[in-house]
């Protein structure tokens, strides 16, 4: 339990506890039953709150799930950075292998697919996702690439947003579209191929 | 109308016409109402057939939609090939710009998102998709890259499956996850970045 200021009213404390219970329930449930069968009723039952409590704070199950992902992200802290040992290729392989592990983890796989599905079909949710989750993560990646660019390891005219897409896009698409298994070897080869490019080097 | 062999029974002809009507209805409807609201009832009404006719041939709306995509693909012929002018970069830009146009076309956008969602959540459908749609398209792409590799334009040790992922994965992920607009300029820059790689060339 965290220490709380004395003037925090009990109601606000209860409200915060309910909120966390609801988000945890949504995240667990979507992993167990899938997004299609996720319901506000089910989340309410699992969290031990009334349906109306959920509807007071969120307009839809997609919105609940999205906040559940945000809560997960908060634990990682606002000052997150990718590793920087000076060896860009090794650092990126480490990060990409960790992403492979996460995507292969059954606790994350189904909730993340559910979120991706919602984003694919809902431009408004996609805009919120870009602003609150994808955007900040992208900045963290770009900061690492920028350091490499300053060190002369990346092309001077490289567009860092495109670089992020070329590094992470193939893995995410392979995962979402199930075009092949996600393995550490795939992660390594992806980094090598993106860094070196497809062209024959003369 | 195509010429038919004389011994084709009327029943088989009617059956083929119903099949095509159902698939066309499924494709049109998913674009209008989205996948969540697509129903066997709706497809049957639009196609002018009974629900039981659909259930006799397909177990689910996802299966109907998948066959609708296959029917669409059949029109493109089995001998499809990417352009080969000898200029790989120009040829790939042409292809990638055509993909951008297709993904931006409202007639295709929603049905293709619906199919992607189904694939993401259904490993069995994903396996059929890989075998019957993604696999053949991937072979066509690899054939063009192989020609470039033989011509000494691509790295000798390049894994062509990885090359396909690095070229197309970022665009497909950007489209599905709505991380940014799909433009001809994006298509061009993606090809250039994938071919040249991210590294500074000394």
Q: Residue ranges of each PLM-predicted region?
A:
Chain A
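Short hydrophobic/aromatic patch on the recognition helix
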Residues: 48-58
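Hydrophobic alpha-helical connector segments
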Residues: 78-109
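C-terminal peripheral helix-coil segments that are non-catalytic and often amphipathic
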Residues: 1-9, 90, 94, 135, ...
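Helix-loop "lid/cap" segments that line or gate small-molecule binding pockets
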Residues: 97-104, 112-121, 193-198
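Tryptophan-centric aromatic hotspots in well-structured domains and transmembrane helices
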Residues: 57-58, 129, 133, 168, ...
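Short amphipathic alpha-helical segment with a characteristic S/N-K-E followed by hydrophobic residues
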Residues: 22, 37, 60-65, 75-79, ...
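Amphipathic alpha-helical packing segments from all-alpha helical-bundle domains
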Residues: 90, 106, 110, 123-150
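Basic, helix-initiating cap at the start of DNA-binding domains
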Residues: 1-46, 63
């Amino acid at each position: 339990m965290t220490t709380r200021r004395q003037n925090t009213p009990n109601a606000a404390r209860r409200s915060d506890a309910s909120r966390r219970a609801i988000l945890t329930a949504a995240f667990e449930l979507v992993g167990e039953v899938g997004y299609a069968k996720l319901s506000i009723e089910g989340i309410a039952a699992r969290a031990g709150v009334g349906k109306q409590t959920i509807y007071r704070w969120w307009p839809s199950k997609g919105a609940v799930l999205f906040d559940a992902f945000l809560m997960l992200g908060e634990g990682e802290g606002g000052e997150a950075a990718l590793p920087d040992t000076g060896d860009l290729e090794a650092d990126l392989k480490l990060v990409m292998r960790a992403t492979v592990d996460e995507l292969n983890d059954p606790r994350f796989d189904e909730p993340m697919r559910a979120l991706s599905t919602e984003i694919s079909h809902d431009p408004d949710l996609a805009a919120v996702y870009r602003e609150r989750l994808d955007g900040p993560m992208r900045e963290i990646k770009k900061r690492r690439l920028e350091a490499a660019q300053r060190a002369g390891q990346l092309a001077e005219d490289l567009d860092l947003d495109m670089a992020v897409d070329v590094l992470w896009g193939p893995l995410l698409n392979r995962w979402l579209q199930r075009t092949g298994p996600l393995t550490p070897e795939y992660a390594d080869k992806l980094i090598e191929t993106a860094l070196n490019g497809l062209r024959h080097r003369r």
